[in-house]
Regions:
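Terminal, non-catalytic domain-edge segments
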Residues: 1-77, 91, 96-156, 161, ...
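Short, aromatic/basic-rich helix-turn unit that serves as a nucleic-acid recognition element
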Residues: 235
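Active-site cradle of extracellular carbohydrate-active enzymes
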Residues: 159-212
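A cross-kingdom feature marking solvent-exposed beta-strand/loop segments within repeated
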Residues: 36-39, 82-86, 178-181, 185, ...
Length: 325
């Protein structure tokens, strides 16, 4: 059992052990304090937030006690007075969503209200933000469009009326042919088309978190299968967020429609085997954020291909707990 490419179940117990060793190696001694990667000497917000997310996925996160309390305090220490969390690697929307999402794993909230996001709650606020994103760079723009929504939802600042406004904008602006965002700005070459799919992923997980009907699930499946058949998901060199974004869109769309179900399941299984082969061959490497991308991808593929990827305990879906990655 466990030869990638054979279609037989693949045992990933050793990969889970490597991930836990990686996280431990990035620890700086105090509870919750992690560097961005093993060997780093400075506490890093993403190191701490991503370590919490990884350990949640692996069912290894302390739920109570002094370790939990110190971790929460450390995460809160990164917040600015306007409510934002900031980091040089990502914009404040992404970083805030990541930090608030990490706190939520401990059933905790940030110390300060997210006042920098309050203008988005006013009439037309979130719609203006989404309208004014640079839709020629949709993947990066989705950090803002989905990160703001995630942070507002997880902190309880966004009421039902706001949620409906947000979902309504997404439904209206979804391209009916591709199922992707944004209508009128879908790139057709392989790179730009995949960027639209990866951007759409960020908005799909907000909709899934809110248990909303999915707009154009059949078209989303067609687009995901197009990227698969066009070879955009090669796991020969690296695996991580790209394969995970794709897997989430395709897997979750199959829950809303039976359209091309057999093809979708076959593609998900093949990509799952490719990702498993990569991590078994190359091991766990990169930054804590890179490893989060690998682990979340494995979790979604384990769910999408039942019985194929075996771990000591089933991997938890981070996005079923909080709407941001």
């Amino acid at each position: 059992m466990g030869e990638p490419g054979s279609g037989a179940p693949v045992v990933l117990d050793g990969v889970v052990e490597q991930v836990l060793e990686f996280v431990t190696a990035a620890g700086l001694g105090a509870a919750g304090e992690y560097a961005a990667s093993p060997g780093g000497a400075e506490p890093d917000l993403y190191g701490s937030a991503d370590a919490a997310a990884i350990r949640y996925i692996l069912s290894d996160l302390p739920a109570d006690g002094a370790t939990r309390d110190q971790w929460v305090a450390h995460l809160r220490s990164f917040q600015d007075s306007d409510g934002a969390f900031r980091h040089t690697s990502h914009n404040a929307f992404h970083t805030t969503a990541q930090a608030v999402g990490a706190l939520d794993l401990f059933d905790a909230q940030p110390s300060h209200r997210l006042s920098f996001l309050e203008p988005l709650l006013a009439a037309g606020g979130i719609e203006s933000l989404l309208d004014e994103l640079d839709w020629t760079q949709p993947w990066m723009g989705s950090w803002t469009g989905a990160g703001s929504a995630s942070a507002l939802l997880v902190t309880g600042m966004a009421d039902r009326a706001w949620q409906q406004r947000y979902l309504g904008w997404l439904a209206q602006e979804t391209d009916p042919v591709s199922g992707l965002l944004r209508r009128g700005s879908i790139g057709q070459d392989s790179g730009t088309f995949f960027a639209n799919l990866a951007a759409t992923f960020h908005y799909v997980f907000v909709g899934e978190y809110l248990a909303a009907p999915m707009t154009a699930p059949e078209a989303k499946i067609d687009s995901a299968l197009r990227t698969y058949t066009d070879g955009m998901l090669s796991a020969d060199r690296s695996v991580g967020f790209a394969q995970g974004d794709w897997a989430y869109v395709l897997n979750r769309a199959t829950r809303h429609t039976s359209h091309r179900g057999d093809e979708a399941r076959a593609a998900l299984r093949e990509v799952a085997l490719g990702v498993a082969d990569n991590v078994l061959t190359h091991g766990i490497q990169g930054s804590m954020h890179d490893v989060l991308g690998v682990v979340t991808t494995l979790a979604e593929l384990q769910n999408a291909a039942p019985g194929l990827l075996l771990t000591p305990r089933p991997l938890r879906s981070l996005l079923d707990r909080r709407p941001f990655l």
